[in-house]
Amino acid sequence: MADLDDIKDGKDFHTDKPQTNTLFALKGCGALDWGMQSRLARIFNPKTRKTVMLAFDHGYFQGPTTGLERIDINIAPLFEYADVLMCTRGILRSVVPPAINKPVVLRASGANSILTELSNEAVAVAMDDAVRLNSCAAAAQVYIGSEHEHQSIKNIIQLIDAGLRVGMPIMAVTGVGKDMARDQRYFSLATRIAAEMGAQIIKTYYVDKGFERIAAGCPVPIVIAGGKKLPEREALEMCYQAIDQGASGVDMGRNIFQSEDPVAMIKAVHAVVHHNETAERAYELFLSEKS
């Protein structure tokens, strides 16, 4: 407690200078509460307003797929190079060292597998557990046009409402129904619906034609999914084109941890996202870093 015997009147009020407060100028976040903006400022670099997320949540429906057999051996060495980790609470508690001190986007939907209809998901994490785990956001699929579209949208709404109560951003992940074309028209629809429901971040796929229209029509930040494994040069070109056309980052898994050299690859992706390197320059970096 302060010593009450030596209280002095303050003198340095700088009355000639108006009070300032630096805004976190992220797309669509100007009206959000301080706590939610603070979490978003950990996900998106405040200087570049971009992010490189490392996704290794695939096991929630795929099991121990290639590259994720041992998270502690294959994925843990990548943690220090990622801006954000995207994983399930089971892996977070059992494998991720708390001292790594990286922001976490927590997978919060599930209850399906590759053996069944993928769109049939439920909310799989209570919001108080996401807070308990010090998550910076929670993520769930939204399957527009699928058999279980209605339930997936309800899942997102449930998480958004719970997130608003505690200052937790929600990332809506646009899953694709079996019979849906992966084109600009579909992803414009899916991303806009998720944003209209109140999601603060949208994860979607890059498309070669019209991606700039998807990004422009979405009022909150978009990060692109890496999708299936591509040759490194092609994956870096996809990153470059997405960022150039309005994406706010990437959320990559297989194109990093299934790479010939995952550390070199995540460094190359970082160069594209945060330093505007071309795919050609980034690929040269990958080759030079490749062990």
From Swiss-Prot:
> GO terms for molecular function, please?
acyltransferase activity, transferring groups other than amino-acyl groups; fructose-bisphosphate aldolase activity
Write down the superkingdom of origin.
Answer: Bacteria
Q: Catalyzes what? A: dihydroxyacetone phosphate + acetyl-CoA = 3-hydroxy-2,4-dioxopentyl phosphate + CoA
Q: Which Gene3D superfamilies match?
A: Aldolase class I
Regions that span the bilayer: none
Q: Enumerate the active-site residues.
A: K203 (schiff-base intermediate with substrate)
Q: What is its EC number?
A: 2.3.1.245
UniProt keyword annotations, A-Z: Cytoplasm, Schiff base, Transferase
Induction summary: In the absence of AI-2, repressed by LsrR. Induced by AI-2, via release of the LsrR repressor.
Subcellular location per the Swiss-Prot or TrEMBL entry = Cytoplasm
The terms describing its cellular component in GO are: cytoplasm
Pfam families given in the database record: DeoC
Its annotated function is as follows:
Involved in the degradation of phospho-AI-2, thereby terminating induction of the lsr operon and closing the AI-2 signaling cycle. Catalyzes the transfer of an acetyl moiety from 3-hydroxy-5-phosphonooxypentane-2,4-dione to CoA to form glycerone phosphate and acetyl-CoA.
Q: Which HAMAP family match?
A: LsrF
Q: Which family does it belong to?
A: Belongs to the DeoC/FbaB aldolase family.
Q: How does it assemble?
A: Homodecamer.
What is the protein name stated in its UniProt record?
3-hydroxy-5-phosphonooxypentane-2,4-dione thiolase
Which species does this protein come from?
Salmonella typhimurium (strain LT2 / SGSC1412 / ATCC 700720)
Report the gene name.
lsrF
